Amino acid sequence: MLFRSERRKQKGVKPLVSERSIRIAFAQVMDALREVHTHKLLHLDLKPANIYLRRDGTPILLDFGAARQTLHSDLSQLHPMYTPGFAAPELHAKRELGPWTDVYSIGASIFCCMLGLPPQSAIERKRDDHMETYLRELERVYSKQLVTLVRWSLALDPLKRPQSVYALQKMIRPTEPPTEQVTAAHNPSSLLSRFRRVVR
């Protein structure tokens, strides 16, 4: 069966969410997440359902329950709630957490915006990883640079991922200055709201 991205290309349909829209929105998400990390906090449950777009197109990170716990908890003892597909493998294995854990979730969220489906869960990937097949198909619709960013972020080995959000920020910035914000008014389905149905 053809992937959604390939079917869209064959039909001459635009990507599910434009690359420019993804870059603009997630550049701002990364700005916010970098600020969170500056305060020695981790989000730990980043996914499209926890990114809210205001009417002016500005994304807001929601659900900081797990992040608040890190103020008073040893990360090695912290077992936050997480969503399969968006959670890094170290969350499942209860290993050391860090900014690289949220980086995995960023990659998973961008992947969801590209394909309309969440990635394989980290547990499934360790048994039989199909993600590379999906990523190669997405290169037919999106730039190689953006797909490389997602691939890098979704590395199962935490040491092979970017260790901070800063490295991703340099790759995600739109190649041209935005001429207008991505707003719910201009795009009724909005950039991320349609994907909340996927993860609920």
For every predicted segment, state its role:
Residues 25-26:
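Activation segment signature within eukaryotic-like protein kinase domains
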Residues 76-90:
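Conserved activation segment of eukaryotic-like protein kinases, specifically the C-terminal portion
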Residues 90-100:
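Conserved end of the kinase activation segment
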